[in-house]
Amino acid sequence: MSVSNLSWLKKKSQSVDITAPGFNPLGGAGKQAPQASKPPAPKTPIIEEEQNNSANTQKHPSRKSELKRFYTIDTGQKKTLDKKDGRRMSFQKPKGTIEYTVESRDSLNSIALKFDTTPNELVQLNKLFSRAVVTGQVLYVPDPEYVSSVESSPSLSPVSPLSPTSSEAEFDKTTTPDVAHPKEAPPASTVSGIRPARVVSSTSEEEEAFTEKFLKINCKYITIGKGTVSGVLLVTPNNIMFDPHKTDPLVQENGCEEYGIMCPMEEVMSAAMYKEILDSKIKESLPIELDQLSGRGSCHSKKATGVSAEDADPRARDQGNDSASTAPRSTEESLSEDAFTESELSPIREELLSSEPRQEKSSDASSESVQTVSQMEVQSLTATSEAANVPDRTSSNPGALSHETGLSGLETATKGGDKATESLQEVSGPKEQSTEVKGQDNQDSSHQESSLQQEAGEDSVSSGETVELKEKPAVLKDQQGQELKRDSETEVEELRKLWKTHSMQQAKQQRDTIQQVSQRESKHSSAAADAHGEGSSLLKEKRRHRLHKFLCLRVGKPMRKTFVSQASATMQQYAQRDKKHEYWFAVPQERTDHLYAFFIQWSPEIYAEDSGEYTREPGFIVVKKMDESEANEAPAGEAAAREWEVVSVAEYHRRIDALNTEELRTLCRRLQITTREDINSKQVAPAKADLEPESFRPNLSDPSELLLPDQIEKLTKHLPPRTIGYPWTLVYGTGKHGTSLKTLYRTMTGLDTPVLMVIKDSDGQVFGALASEPFKVSDGFYGTGETFVFTFCPEFEVFKWTGDNMFFIKGDMDSLAFGGGGGEFALWLDGDLYHGRSHSCKTFGNHTLSKKEDFFIQDIEIWAFE
């Protein structure tokens, strides 16, 4: 009975399979009829398994067409190998990436560092479930040469339909190779109701914009006294971190420990963007390229501003010439920027993009330059006289400078490398004709300049038509102008014929001759250029602001150094607790808006208070955002240099409270109202003044032979708080215990207080050190940040711990040292306590404590506080 029930259940399951969407009645009819006619018979498990496998293989080809759309939907059946391959093949290669094969020593962090990205970005690109990678694994990494274009990204369209991907097309080929007539596509209504295949890729720029939760900016970290280093500023919602580039010269010299910093976002009190740095200390650390970004042509900037087109354009003739590349490039940049920013000729750049006008202008310019060279070779004396006449004509006609400067900017944007010789020919042409017409020198030059200005106007109007030199001749009013017009047309035809016959050797001679002429002209034009020095400085300032802005971060606690141990970083933070916590970065101008937008997303909502909704605690509040209209009216100073500033909520309330308190005090003074604070301050101030000298006079067990009373008072003000109130006990003195370092160590036994060492050398100078622990023999350095060194030579100075290292005290049997770093000690004594040495060191940032680096010890006193 059990066997009959089993066969009945199998028939039932087969009848259900007939209605399955992938069932093929033609393929299954031949098999189902014999099974129905046979009587039920007992079957072994092996036979049942073979029949189930054969049934699955019969149904598989008919269902391949449906797998294309349904392979991501769980049907409750066992997934086949083809289905897994289809899922794997649907992973598209993201745009802007290349394939990278993991090597044996690679990790996800090392791969991210190699391709200038982050491990999180690699995880998102490759849809990884962990950060573990294996050798031979293929990963998609960002292509450094990829340039994203908004026009070519189809994902930017929000209404674009889902189109079949290349992986789906390959899936069709691999899964249905033997089907001659595939199943017809269902109607559109059916397709819309079916869930499309999942495409595992994130190449959309919109999606990247939403998933990118950090800023990665290449900038420069400006330190105080330690130079400026290049690196990467990483700004995340939780931290701000700067990693220096290992290839930077200062990093290679001083190490990464000096420049790698990080702080939590909660510690940031203020972030402000400045056009320039006004602090003199920070300004001294600026490199030349940041302080004067236009300094590449500083020696030529004055000349470039005042020189006319015939002077500047020949120097900008050949940009590929290495021997004279600095001056021409800087001159060309200054002239082109002046022409297009001040004369507003920028539309010409877009109008002259067609190749035909540019080629014809280049050929005309080159042909004219060839004739210029031939004329210079035949009549060198005439060329010299013409070069001498250039400044005369410039000074005689003040309007010529502006016209020619605008023309040079126009030629810079349109004619490329051949523009210089054409302008030289245009200058020399009228001068040769002026020798024939002796009495009308200035008139001809003014006519020629007006014609050049008219030609520039015609260029700005016509954008697509072919422009030739003969189609825009000089238009002159008198008969002489008509003759010049006909002569210019004739010269153009002759010049075109001459151009075909000249070789590269003549072009080289032409460049040499032009450089000689430009050198002569630059000497004569230096006087005219000095008058425009003020305009040149303004151009430098404008260009500097155009390239870099300065980000100032003010934090509540010092930033922690990232390339040192946790203990060292904590101690360095403690050492810098009393300093001004301000950090400056030179940021590219195009990233300043990104920083502002990044901080803005934590600012409170504008209408949160009106609507009564307060969703989250705000992070930053905008206190200053300068508009263009305000920038012109802003007064000089720090407020004018600051473009925007965002502050934390705590800092905002602190400023408001300080402002209200100051306004309240001002109002009380104006109304002559005496507050309780004023009364208390007047009563307490005299008492403090009387008690202050007494409070800093400690009791000494023995009179000091090295320190005066006023020196003791000065030292007491800088002692650690745990020593205040304790008497000074003399535990060691050379006059009492002798000059031996071993004896000094024996007298320190059993002490548990800071000790003060005072030294007097043979020159009569007094200096010393305060040790946080008694002196002892040690294997390495010991002590805490309470240790400092001091000197009274020539005036009293105290050098406390800088936080750079933890080399405080080192005791050996034959020496005793304070401070270290770079192989130098702040103070070093030998085993006989007779010879000593002092040098500047990083631990305390001190200078030489004595008059001379090497000194002889006359007397020593060591005081304990107990």
UniProtKB/Swiss-Prot annotation:
Highly expressed in brain and testis. GO terms for biological process: adult walking behavior; cellular response to hydroperoxide; negative regulation of cellular response to oxidative stress; negative regulation of neuron apoptotic process; neuron apoptotic process. Residues 1-92, 150-202, 293-540, 682-703 are annotated as: Disordered. It comes from the Eukaryota. GO terms for molecular function: oxidoreductase activity. The modification Phosphothreonine is found at residues 118, 341. PROSITE patterns: LYSM, TLDC. Residues 98-141 form the LysM domain. Its main location: mitochondrion. May be involved in protection from oxidative damage. This is Oxidation resistance protein 1.
